[in-house]
Amino acid sequence: MADGRPATLDDFCRRFDISFFDLRLTCIFCSHTVDLADLALFYLKKLSLVFRGNCYYACCSECLRLSALFEQENYFQCSIKAVHLEEIAQKKIKEICIRCICCLRLLDIVEKLDLLYSDETCYLIRGLWRGYCRNCIRKQ
């Protein structure tokens, strides 16, 4: 909330005194109402709301998946083996922000360590590190 506007769903609910279960937000991409299940996933993925034209927007899961694919195809910078990530980023693995390349979920420490010890690849896309989360790696 650096500019006074809520950035997360919980900030939004607190600021406007609304229950999460009563939220009605539109998807920034497809303009459909984001259903409760997708809002819950949006929250769990630690994504930020978009404020545009005096309205707040979230993103549905399908558009998130398509957005991740679009960014992968258009903003790919490089890929490295996860074992080299700490050296390249000059940070410990627990301090590196890594999102899932497919669903954009923020990876937890177990998933990051799994990337490291399984000799998986990490991808730099739009200046942000990406790898596979535990759900999407199984679908690969």
Swiss-Prot record:
Gene Ontology biological process terms in this record: DNA-templated transcription; regulation of DNA-templated transcription; symbiont-mediated perturbation of host apoptosis; symbiont-mediated perturbation of host ubiquitin-like protein modification; symbiont-mediated suppression of host innate immune response; symbiont-mediated suppression of host type I interferon-mediated signaling pathway
Zinc fingers classed as unnamed: ranges: 27-63, 100-136
GO CC list: host cell cytoplasm; host cell nucleus
GO MF annotation: an example: DNA binding
Compartments it resides in: Host cytoplasm; Host nucleus
Keywords in alphabetical order: Activator, DNA-binding, Early protein, Host cytoplasm, Host nucleus, Host-virus interaction, Inhibition of host innate immune response by virus, Metal-binding, Modulation of host cell apoptosis by virus, Transcription, Transcription regulation, Viral immunoevasion, Zinc, Zinc-finger
Pfam families recorded: E6
The keyword Transmembrane is annotated on this UniProt entry: no
Family according to the record: Belongs to the papillomaviridae E6 protein family.
Complex formation: Forms homodimers. Interacts with ubiquitin-protein ligase UBE3A/E6-AP; this interaction stimulates UBE3A ubiquitin activity. Interacts with host BAK1.
Role noted for this protein: Plays a major role in the induction and maintenance of cellular transformation. E6 associates with host UBE3A/E6-AP ubiquitin-protein ligase and modulates its activity. Protects host keratinocytes from apoptosis by mediating the degradation of host BAK1. May also inhibit host immune response.
Protein name: Protein E6
Source organism: Human papillomavirus 4
